[in-house]
Amino acid sequence: MELHQLKSVSKSRNHKSKVVGRGHGSGLGKTSSRGQKGQKARKSGLTRLGFEGGQTPLYRRLPKYGVANKGILKKRWVVLNLNKVAKLNLKTVTRATLIEKKVISKKNNLPLKLIGNTKLTTPIHFEVQKISKNALNAVQTSKGSVKIIT
């Protein structure tokens, strides 16, 4: 059997859809297959998703969780690790030099924070907004300097 030999089963294509609510003679007049009275018989009778007949629905009985704006007030930083900075072989580390070396994006306006406790072999001058105690000790032991920018 092939596709062009297929035929429809008898009476399967004879079903015509009827327009409801157009008089008794149409077959679906008066109540338009909605039954007699009640909420579902009315024009706006369909209930919303989760409706439980006036009872407090489940989505309102359960507690809220997962606040959407949790980190919106949190201070964010671009964290620089001494390991990565030492591999760049720079004498001074500023936002401009980091953008030039493509360590951070030009669009990134977040303040810089220096962390880590790697021993530096050469003295490096840093210009950052914040620095950890360990990173400050590591920079000072290598005879480098740190300028805190506000």
Curated annotation (Swiss-Prot):
Disulfide bonds: none annotated. Gene3D superfamilies: 3.100.10.10. SUPFAM superfamilies: Ribosomal proteins L15p and L18e (SSF52080). Residues 10-21 have a biased composition (Basic residues). GO terms for molecular function: rRNA binding; structural constituent of ribosome. The keyword Mitochondrion does not apply. GO terms for biological process: translation. PANTHER family: 50S RIBOSOMAL PROTEIN L15 (PTHR12934), LARGE RIBOSOMAL SUBUNIT PROTEIN UL15M (PTHR12934:SF11). This is Large ribosomal subunit protein uL15. The gene is rplO.
